[in-house]
């Protein structure tokens, strides 16, 4: 039997399997990273929606805004998001700066923020 008729040796098979397994591990890492990224994007999306909602509410409210901080909880995406609205006077006393920060459930880190200005009434 000649060398070309014998087929693959055990060593060649082990090397081929090792190369294939490295490729499989790389694909699994990529899938895991995609899942983590999707979860982070979901958090930022809902936090941004809550921040925008509260900021627009502050701009469009008919009554005057109290200077200082207020906080509350808003439901979005089936979860309760904590928001804090800080109202401060701007450089011009007729302008108010409204900063809304939003934290995801079970954490204290800020995931979304909106800053708007409105006329003090």
At which residue positions do the language-model features occur?
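Short, strongly hydrophobic transmembrane alpha-helices
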Residues: 22-31
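Flexible, low-complexity segments enriched in proline/glycine/serine and punctuated by aromatic residues
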Residues: 8, 14-18, 32-121
């Amino acid at each position: 039997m000649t060398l070309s008729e014998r087929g693959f040796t055990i060593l060649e098979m082990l090397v081929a399997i090792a190369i294939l397994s490295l490729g499989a591990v790389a694909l699994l890492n990529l899938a895991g990273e995609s899942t983590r990224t999707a979860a982070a994007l979901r958090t930022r999306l809902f936090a941004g929606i809550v921040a925008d909602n509260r900021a627009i509410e502050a701009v469009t409210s008919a009554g005057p805004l109290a200077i200082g901080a207020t906080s509350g909880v808003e439901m979005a995406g089936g979860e309760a998001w904590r928001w804090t609205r800080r109202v401060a006077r701007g450089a011009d006393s007729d302008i108010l700066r409204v900063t809304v920060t939003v934290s995801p459930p079970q954490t204290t880190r800020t995931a979304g923020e909106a800053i708007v200005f409105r006329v003090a009434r």
